[in-house]
């Protein structure tokens, strides 16, 4: 006798009742062995051990409308990688699949008895990284798309007293992870499916329904569903999972649903919504929904299409200020994930999580409890045998920097060609990139922003503990974190003041290796004026902040170093612009150098009060080369140091840009302010994941104008989970966050990703996954509808392997995110 499989579903929980095994699977295991012919491929399942592959399982069931039931189904999982000592077997076949331009073997694959086993990594080739594998069975989508494979019945609803089929079935499906070694040109993946059943009649609140779907061959062949929208989380209700301060002047959530091949659901306006206390389940606030953006209206950002493909309804509860933990529920539809309204569990918590993400990028020290749950040995330290050689190539002329002359074709060519035998023993520490382990001076944008927070609210941030190794010293933790990233460049500063632009290996990381297992040659970039300007500006800011908090002796060290770097950079700059080859310098490099020169001049003038830097700032000030960072400094200088007209120009620069951002936010369905005019949304610009533009912070601090604060808060909603995916775009935050950022250390050692990593996020797939590319082909094949047809606001694929979505950078993602959240926590 076979035991039927049922689930009981209510309050967003699924309880299996009577499930011993799946009899549908047991009837014929062979037909589910879909990988049997592909076991020689990387990422395929392990050889058969007689263990049954698990069927797809139901993760959540809820309505998106009173007559549309959404069933969320997950399929397959990945067996994590692990590193073990390599013990050679006579049957092993070793293949070198990649070498650096120097002939360094940085990818050695092991095949044992015809089966791909893993990669040999690390010094001495003593470690084996076992390949990840897929486990489980994919959803039979043909069965899932057939309305005849579903029945709904209920003894409590006369409309459903007899079994009925849905009148239509729609679906959207997406990959949710790729095996690490199968991420490029691969075929294996895990998946998530949203199945929408268009019901013949409206459901009745409080009534239990039995939904049968045996032909889908899931972990249960039927389930009971209690229709109680005030308790069940609905995919259609989008709220920030970070929450709000009580005095935040703007608090919104959203309602929308794009049903894949069913299109966007059209909701009536004036729906009632409520704020419900998570503890008491009592209604605390009620309001009426209003139309935010219609699905047929193009947005004024990105490629100026509609980026949601569904009506976006706004749920405004700005007038609700009572501290507590809540969920927002829409009448007849369902609820959001829970969120807090208070001063400690919201922006401050998010700020601390983001700062922990920055800490987890430290190089040169071991990472382990109690400072982080991510465990990693010390990386790239000379005492462990790592040698860093001087290159004659500067970051200015590297493809990893500005590639000023356009001569670097593969990012590493000029660096490696400039190799010398000179060792740079001081080249350790700093903060690493994401999928790579470089430390480039561009990362100092984060240190600059952290120091700015300290400068704006020293009394607030001096007491914030970030739980880092320096927490017991006499500096605020925020300053310590900024200085850790900065100090490597001071240690590498040349006696004449020149600043090296960072540290880089000869190639991208070896497959399967971790940061403490580098086998490639490692180089320090040669000094250049661009890198020296960046350093001079941030070091000057460090000195200024140290003076503010009373650390005058430490401030002197940084001031001397900053001035020395600037005085070296100026004649180098003059030589650069007067040499014959300057005409060949690409325009973007000229602009970037001018920007950093202008900013460094502003920083040094504020710090030293030396008029030569004031003259340089004013001489280099223009629309292209003055960032709001520099204008923000100049606009706040003591009146005795500036001409009133010049200071007004600085202030106007900030406010004009902030006003443009306010306007831009109004032209976006979700109020985004990180878009760059004329560019598609997403990619390295991280349009969706960076909460807001720092310019809005500066405008609000200067004026106190609530419009800027409201725009900040509105823009910060999307990345906090108030988006069509209900996904927080930073690891470790909220109840549903990104799981698979491109973080090689954890991926290759079977650990969860560290918290605090803000990924690049969704993008306009047609732009960033070009026709004919690997990602375009995979997403079009693995998604329903095709991945290139998805709305960009929902086009985040948490697959680890797509750098334009799953990666992040210290200076572009982590720094600005912590800065925005830190300001929202501290602001007055």
Locate each region found by the language model.
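Aromatic (Trp/Tyr) and acidic
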Residues: 47-193, 242-243, 249-331, 345, ...
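Short acidic/polar inter-strand loop motif in beta-rich domains
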Residues: 215-221, 332-338
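Low-complexity, Pro/Ser/Thr- and charge-rich linker/hinge segments at domain boundaries
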Residues: 30, 226-250, 336-375
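Bacterial Sec-dependent N-terminal signal peptides
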Residues: 1-28
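Solenoid-like repeat scaffolds
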Residues: 620-626
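Carboxylate/His-rich catalytic cores and anion/metal-binding grooves
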Residues: 475-499
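Short coil/linker segments at helix-helix boundaries
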Residues: 452-484, 521, 541-558
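Surface-exposed, short loops/turns at beta-strand junctions within beta-sandwich domains
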Residues: 198-206, 318-323
